[in-house]
Amino acid sequence: MSTRLEKAILSALIYADIFDYPLTIKEIGKYLIQFKIQSASWRTKFKITAKDLEFIKYKNSFYYLIGRENIIKTRREREQWSVEKIKKADKISHILKFIPTVRLIGITGALAVNNSKEEDDIDLLIITKRGLLWTTRFLMSNLAKFGIK
């Protein structure tokens, strides 16, 4: 492996592989490590480069490391579980947004990239107005006691 692009592609795929997450070509472009895409023709360069790299395989719109084809199925299963969890997180956030001290509610963790396992919980990032963290926590805790979980 000699070019910077090849190293960047491999780095992105290795990192994603840690999470059993094959990447689409668009995601590879998004997650390239230490490489800036400077032209619209990078996808063509990528396809040529990927064909030359013996340790990268392609199937069903996904790129993955050799011997890891099974992670395509894993990703699809986790995407389905994530859809349900996002629906639940959306319902929760619609309620929590009425707490006047809440500035932002965001989804974090594996769910943020649609890679949530069936047994994973929903991780939310809550940003509050300055100086009102504990007030917000108190209000949210009380909401949780009354069935909002």
Residue ranges and their predicted role:
Residues 1-106:
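Helical scaffold of the NTase/Pol beta-like nucleotidyltransferase catalytic core
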Residues 32-36, 119, 148:
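Short amphipathic alpha-helical patches
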Residues 88-90, 129-133, 148-149:
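Glycine-rich loops and low-complexity Gly/Arg-rich segments
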Residues 109, 113-134:
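Catalytic metal-binding acidic patch
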Residues 140-149:
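Conserved catalytic core of two-metal-ion nucleotidyltransferases
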